Amino acid sequence: MGPMGFVAVGVGAAVGAWLRWFFSVTWNAINPALPYGTLASNLVGGYLIGLAVAFFETHPSLPPEWRLLAVTGFLGGLTTFSTFSSEVIANLMAGDYRWAMLHLAMHLGGSLLLTAFGIWSYRALA
């Protein structure tokens, strides 16, 4: 990949990380046991990756930098498996097993459902 690929990933990642930070500072304090900002980042990212998968599947002639910008950069910066993991572990270490399991179910199940819904949405509108 050429220099434009690096630029595309970097720009997308910066914007995605800023949005994730905004979600976190806006919503995480509402419920520390299930930080809504992290959940929003992962669910919105799950839906958008579904849209992106369907979009790029139907537009194979687009330059690869667009996929790098949107998927690797923006969605990689927006979604956060590491923060999600640390929040689940914090719940487990505090003995909040119910919150830990709810956290797991909402992030993983919700993201998978919204990814499928994103693909379906794009195909329904295309």
Swiss-Prot record:
GO terms for cellular component: plasma membrane. Keywords: Cell inner membrane, Cell membrane, Ion channel, Ion transport, Membrane, Metal-binding, Sodium, Transmembrane, Transmembrane helix, Transport. It comes from the Bacteria. It catalyses: fluoride(in) = fluoride(out). GO terms for biological process: cellular detoxification of fluoride. Na(+) binds at residues 76, 79. It is found in: Cell inner membrane. It is a multi-pass membrane protein. The chain crosses the membrane at residues 5-25, 36-56, 69-89, 99-119. The keyword Transport applies. Na(+) is not transported, but it plays an essential structural role and its presence is essential for fluoride channel function. Disulfide bonds: none annotated. It holds the Pfam family CRCB. GO terms for molecular function: fluoride channel activity; metal ion binding. Fluoride-specific ion channel. Important for reducing fluoride concentration in the cell, thus reducing its toxicity. Belongs to the fluoride channel Fluc/FEX (TC 1.A.43) family. PANTHER family: FLUORIDE EXPORT PROTEIN 1-RELATED. This is Fluoride-specific ion channel FluC. The lineage of its organism: Bacteria, Pseudomonadati, Pseudomonadota, Betaproteobacteria, Burkholderiales.
